[in-house]
Amino acid sequence: VHLTGEEKSAVTALWGKVNVDEVGGEALGRLLVVYPWTQRFFDSFGDLSSADAIMGNPKVKAHGKKVLNSFSDGLKNLDNLKGTFAKLSELHCDKLHVDPENFKLLGNVLVCVLAHHFGKEFTPQVQAAYQKVVAGVANALAHKYH
């Protein structure tokens, strides 16, 4: 991902304020609600029967936190996203058979959740920088797909 120095600073400054537990669960939960076909990858998560069930599901929250912790690793390695996400790309491709388009969907949902949480602080410039980052992460996660 090519970010200017200003964009990198904006991304890392805002990320320092993110509550990974809260935002991760909310982003993954919203993905599962808005794009219900993504639920098929989470059969073992129990009750995903309604928006309330999904948003309150402890397994969704825990996995959302895990996802955002990985995203944090990516933010520390913006110049080597493919290397950073190589193992996760392989896992999601070869073992889990996740449609790589879902990575883009989750990235866009994450941007919406960040905008909701940070309001005016999530300026158009910050949003543009985050859009670049989530696109880069989605691309890196899709790298092992044929």
Swiss-Prot record:
Keyword Transport on entry: yes
Tissue specificity remark: Red blood cells.
Tagged with keyword Heme: yes
Entry's Gene Ontology molecular function annotations: haptoglobin binding; heme binding; hemoglobin alpha binding; metal ion binding; organic acid binding; oxygen binding; oxygen carrier activity; peroxidase activity
Modified residues (N6-acetyllysine): 59, 82, 144
One GO cellular component, as annotated: haptoglobin-hemoglobin complex
Ranges in a coiled coil: none
Residues of the Globin domain: 2-146
Annotated positions of the Phosphoserine modification: 44
Residues modified to Phosphothreonine: 12
Family as reported in the entry's similarity comment: Belongs to the globin family.
Record's function text: Involved in oxygen transport from the lung to the various peripheral tissues.
This protein's name: Hemoglobin subunit beta
Species: Phoca vitulina (Harbor seal)
Gene giving rise to this polypeptide: HBB
